[in-house]
Amino acid sequence: MSHNDTIVAQATPPGRGGVGILRISGLKARDVAQAVLGKLPKPRYADYLPFNDVDGTPLDQGIALWFPGPNSFTGEDVLELQGHGGPVILDLLLKRILTLPGLRIARPGEFSERAFLNDKLDLAQAEAIADLIDASSEQAARSALNSLQGAFSARVNHLVEALTHLRIYVEAAIDFPDEEIDFLSDGKIEAQLNEVMADLDAVRAEARQGSLLREGMKVVIAGRPNAGKSSLLNALAGREAAIVTDIAGTTRDVLREHIHIDGMPLHIIDTAGLRDANDEVERIGIERAWQEIAQADRVLFMVDGTTTSAVDPAEIWPDFIERLPAKLPITVVRNKADVTGEALGISEVNGHSLIRLSARTGDGVEVLRNHLKQSMGFDTNMEGGFLARRRHLQALEEAANHLQQGKAQLLGAWAGELLAEELRLAQQALSEITGEFTSDDLLGRIFSSFCIGK
C-alpha cells in the first residue's frame, strides 16, 4: 500500500462509549473536512459542527480538530472527528468518509508508522506508544512515557555520537600512518573505547530493567502431586485462583496468574503434579507442565517438607533435575513448614536458593516475593528509566560484542582496519534501535502489532 494514500481509522476502542474518534491523515484530509463539515476548521481549535452525510443530512454532531501538516502527529494533514461513541454512528460516519476518492482504512500502526517515516519520532519512541497503551503497572506506564519523550533514544544517540568520534580518530590513524605519533598505540583510542563500553554497559543494565517491566518474568511452579503448588499460587496471587484439595492430581491443566511485585510483572504458572500417570487427561496435563518449564525464566521446585528432609534438589528428585533445561535457574521451596516446624527463611544449597515456607498459612511467602524480585536484578527505584523490548536488548548485546572484538583487535594486533569495521558494525546495531538503520521487514513487524487507530 502507498504512503501517499489518505487513511482513516477509529482511534477509540470498539464498542459503546461517551466519545468516539475518527482520525484521518493525508493529502485528502482537507477534502474530508469540506465534504463532511462543510468547511475547513481553524487549525488547532475545537470546532463544534454537524457531521453530514452525502445528501447533507447530519449523521452526528461533535468536535472537529484540524492539524495541517507538517505540524501534526503524522507530519501530514490530520483531521479528527470526535462524535458520540456508538458503534452504529461511528460506522455510518466511517462509511461516509470512505465514499470519497483516495481514502482507505488504515493498517494497524500506520499513523505511528507515518510519524516515524516523516521524522516526527524515532522507532524507539514509536514503540513506546504501544508500550504505554499496554502498560500493566504505574511504573511501566511512567517508563513507557519516558521512552516516548526520548529518554531511551537520547542514551542510544549519545553512544552513536561517541562511536562516531572514535571512528574518526581511528580512521585518521589508518589514513596517516607516517605521522610521528602512533595514534593506535598512544592509549587514547583504548581509553575512549573503554569509556564507550562502560556507557554501553550502563545502558544495557537499564534496558534489562526496562525489559523486565515490559515483558515480566515467567515463573513455573513444579513438583510432585500434593506438594502445595496450587496453594503457593493462591498465596502469591492473593486470591483463590486454583482449587486446593488433599487429592493428588487435582490440578490437571496449566493455571496462569499475572501479578506484580513492587511494580515488576510476574507470570506465575501452576502445573500438574509430575508423576507417571495412568489417566490420559492427567498425562496431557503433565506434558503441558514440561512444555511450560522449558519456556520458564525460573522454576520453583515445590517440595513437601513432610516427605523428605533433603534440601539438595539433585538428592530430592534427581530425574527431575536431569530433565530440566541447562542453566535454568531453580529455587527449591520446602513447603509445609507449619507442620515440620522448620525455621522460615532463605539459604543457599549447592548453588540453588532454598526457601522454607508455608503456602497454607502464608508464612515465608514474602521472603519468596523478595527473592523473585532480587533474582532478576529488579530495581524498584527506576526514576527516569525507560522500557525496552527484546530486539533492543539484542541490538545492545550485538553492539557490545562488536566492541569487545574491536578491543581485542586493537590490543592483540594493533589492527586499525579491523577495529574500524567493528566500530562501524556496533554503530549500525545501535542505529537499529532508533530506526536510523532498519529493514522494511522489521518496520512491518513492529507497526503491525499496534492498534488500528495508532
Swiss-Prot record:
Binds 1 potassium ion per subunit. This is tRNA modification GTPase MnmE. The lineage of its organism: Bacteria, Pseudomonadati, Pseudomonadota, Gammaproteobacteria, Enterobacterales. The gene is mnmE. Mg(2+) binds at residues 230, 251. Residues 216-377 form the TrmE-type G domain. SUPFAM superfamilies: P-loop containing nucleoside triphosphate hydrolases (SSF52540), TrmE connector domain (SSF116878). Its EC number is 3.6.-.-. It comes from Klebsiella pneumoniae subsp. pneumoniae (strain ATCC 700721 / MGH 78578). GTP binds at residues 226-231, 245-251, 270-273, 335-338, 358-360. PANTHER family: TRNA MODIFICATION GTPASE GTPBP3, TRNA MODIFICATION GTPASE GTPBP3, MITOCHONDRIAL. Keywords: Cytoplasm, GTP-binding, Hydrolase, Magnesium, Metal-binding, Nucleotide-binding, Potassium, tRNA processing. Exhibits a very high intrinsic GTPase hydrolysis rate. Involved in the addition of a carboxymethylaminomethyl (cmnm) group at the wobble position (U34) of certain tRNAs, forming tRNA-cmnm(5)s(2)U34. One of its GO terms (biological process) is tRNA wobble uridine modification. GO terms for molecular function: GTP binding; GTPase activity; metal ion binding. GO terms for cellular component: cytosol. K(+) binds at residues 226, 245, 247, 250.
